[in-house]
């Protein structure tokens, strides 16, 4: 059996640019990509915390240290500057591998400052 698992997550990054006329994609600060293990041109899913939109695109490298999150092309209709996003990448693996897999999760402040990194998401309390 093959399972699709969370590989990397950027939690609550802020959109710094939205460019409808750029050639698709989402530009992400290279430091952020490294923190979540996201590669350039990798497929990503984006969840907009502010408006509920969910969409797919691919990552491109933004200038390292710039804190850029630029939603480009048609995806720019799904997010505005200032919106909070969750950006995820996924990986497929065997059931056996999935049972010991840990994602790379990076948590951000309101101004795209990396606050902490984790290898798991906390259990949600009832």
Curated annotation (Swiss-Prot):
Location in or out of the cell: Cytoplasm
Domain of life: Bacteria
Catalytic activity: L-aspartate + H(+) = beta-alanine + CO2
UniProt record, GO biological process: alanine biosynthetic process; pantothenate biosynthetic process
SUPFAM superfamilies: ADC-like
Binding of substrate, residues: 57, 73-75
PTM comment: Is synthesized initially as an inactive proenzyme, which is activated by self-cleavage at a specific serine bond to produce a beta-subunit with a hydroxyl group at its C-terminus and an alpha-subunit with a pyruvoyl group at its N-terminus.
Keywords from the UniProt entry: Autocatalytic cleavage, Cytoplasm, Decarboxylase, Lyase, Pantothenate biosynthesis, Pyruvate, Schiff base, Zymogen
Any single Gene Ontology cellular-component annotation: cytosol
Needed co-factor(s): pyruvate
Binding partners and assembly: Heterooctamer of four alpha and four beta subunits.
Family, as annotated: Belongs to the PanD family.
Annotated protein name in UniProt: Aspartate 1-decarboxylase
Native species: Pectobacterium atrosepticum (strain SCRI 1043 / ATCC BAA-672) (Erwinia carotovora subsp. atroseptica)
